[in-house]
C-alpha cells in the first residue's frame, strides 16, 4: 500500500494507525476531526513519511506512510 502513495496523491488518515502512535503521543492528544473526516494531498514523500496538506487552513504535517491510505 505505501508504495502506491506518491506526490500529488489524495489520501485519508487511518485512525487506528495514527492513534497511540509515536507521532500522536508526541503532540496534543486531541486530534482534530478534519484529520479523519477529510482527504489530504501528498506534497512530498521522504523515506517512510509523507508531507500532507488538508484542505482547511492548517499547516501541513508529516505522517508515516502506514498511517495513510489512498483515496
UniProtKB/Swiss-Prot annotation:
What's the chief localization of this chain? Answer: membrane
Which Pfam families does this entry report, sorted A to Z? NdhO
GO cellular component terms? plasma membrane-derived thylakoid membrane
Name its cellular compartments.
Cellular thylakoid membrane
Q: Which InterPro entries match?
A: NdhO
Q: What is its EC number?
A: 7.1.1.-
Q: Which superkingdom heads the taxonomic lineage of this protein's source?
A: Bacteria
The alphabetized UniProt keywords are: Membrane, NAD, NADP, Plastoquinone, Quinone, Thylakoid, Translocase, Transport
Q: Partners and quaternary state? A: NDH-1 can be composed of about 15 different subunits; different subcomplexes with different compositions have been identified which probably have different functions.
Q: What does this protein do?
A: NDH-1 shuttles electrons from an unknown electron donor, via FMN and iron-sulfur (Fe-S) centers, to quinones in the respiratory and/or the photosynthetic chain. The immediate electron acceptor for the enzyme in this species is believed to be plastoquinone. Couples the redox reaction to proton translocation, and thus conserves the redox energy in a proton gradient. Cyanobacterial NDH-1 also plays a role in inorganic carbon-concentration.
Recorded protein name is: NAD(P)H-quinone oxidoreductase subunit O
Organism this protein belongs to: Microcystis aeruginosa (strain NIES-843 / IAM M-2473)
* Name of the encoding gene: ndhO
